[in-house]
Design a protein with these regions (language model features):
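Hydrophobic alpha-helical membrane-insertion segments
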Residues: 50-56, 90-111, 175-185, 259
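Extracellular loop-to-transmembrane helix junctions
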Residues: 35-61, 87, 141-142
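Transmembrane helix-boundary motif of multi-pass solute transporters/channels
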Residues: 10-48, 234-243, 252-254, 258
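Central hydrophobic cores of alpha-helical transmembrane segments in multi-pass inner-membrane proteins
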Residues: 51-63, 67, 73-74, 149-158, ...
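Membrane-interface "cap" regions at the ends of multi-pass membrane proteins
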Residues: 1-30, 58-63, 67-79, 85-89, ...
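Hydrophobic alpha-helical transmembrane segments of multi-pass membrane proteins
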Residues: 16-22, 48-53, 90-101, 148-155, ...
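Membrane-embedded translocation segments of transport machinery
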Residues: 2-8, 12, 170-259
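Inter-helical loop and helix-membrane interface segments of multi-pass membrane transporters/permeases
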Residues: 2-5, 34-38, 68-90, 103-162, ...
């Protein structure tokens, strides 16, 4: 039986929203450093193994639960077992905590973009080096851009699943892909780029020499996997609740982590 509430208007729209949930600042900023600090290619190997044997299964399970119940995280677990709503509340709580710092970073990015554009079209350079110091010293500005970022999110969510989140994701995700390719090309042309690539990708298997260091890498890779794929916070359950019964969950579950 199809859900009576709204649904994704297309599988492409769902994929863009789900990939957008997975590809965030945690990957752009955090993942490269975690790779380099935890054995480079050795960390990547552990991460890929976890995604293949754990991430795919958890994501498929969450999407299945969401589509089957047609409810958000709390309601879905309550539908499975009346004693399990606390699992959904924990997921919502973790998402709320993540929003706490993502909204601040989002406001900072908006302020940086505004400063860059104003100075670029004004013919002046933008002093990126001093930006962060001036940013944290300007509390009213921080609060203002934080509020603006939250307001934009509220407007998008109020548009509904297809008219808001899906429509925005169809534009934002291709734009993000173009920006990432631009950044990759730009970074590759910078002095010291090769040293950075070596730091990230050259495997250092000495991290597996002791049980403690191995579990440190495993813990870091597992945390990155759950964070990167938006697992355990109810996002995929909620997205799955708006999926049509005709969509192929297995294929979607493969596409999202790979993207």
């Amino acid at each position: 039986m199809e859900n009576n509430k709204g649904q994704w208007s297309s599988n492409f729209g769902f994929l863009m929203a789900a990939i957008g949930s997975a590809v965030g600042l945690g990957n752009i900023w955090g993942f490269p450093y975690k790779m380099g600090a935890n054995g480079g290619g050795a960390f990547l190997l552990v991460y890929v193994i976890l995604v293949v044997f754990v991430g795919f299964a958890v994501m498929l399970g969450e999407l299945t639960i969401g589509r089957k119940t047609g409810k958000g995280a709390v309601g879905a677990y309550r539908a499975l077992n009346k004693k399990l709503p606390w699992v959904g509340y924990m997921g919502v709580g973790s998402a709320f905590l993540i929003l706490g710092f993502y909204s601040v970073l989002g406001g900072m990015v908006m302020r940086y973009m505004l400063g860059f554009l104003v100075n670029m079209f004004g013919g002046a350079g933008f002093a990126a080096e001093g930006f962060f110091g001036s940013w944290i010293a300007n509390m009213p500005g921080m609060v203002g851009f934080y509020a603006l970022f939250m307001l934009l999110n509220i407007v998008i969510v109020m548009g509904g699943i297809s008219g808001g989140i899906e429509k925005f994701s169809k534009v934002a995700m291709p734009a993000l892909a173009v920006m990432l390719v631009t950044v990759i090309v730009y970074v590759a042309c910078q002095p010291g780029a090769m040293e950075g690539y070596k730091f990230m990708f050259v495997p250092d298997f000495s991290v597996f020499d002791s049980l403690k260091s191995f579990f440190d890498v495993l813990k870091s890779a597992a945390g990155q996997m759950f964070f990167s794929l938006s697992l355990g916070m109810g996002a995929m359950i909620t997205y799955g609740s708006y999926l049509s019964k005709s969509e192929d969950l297995n294929t979607n579950t493969i596409i999202i982590p790979v993207a």
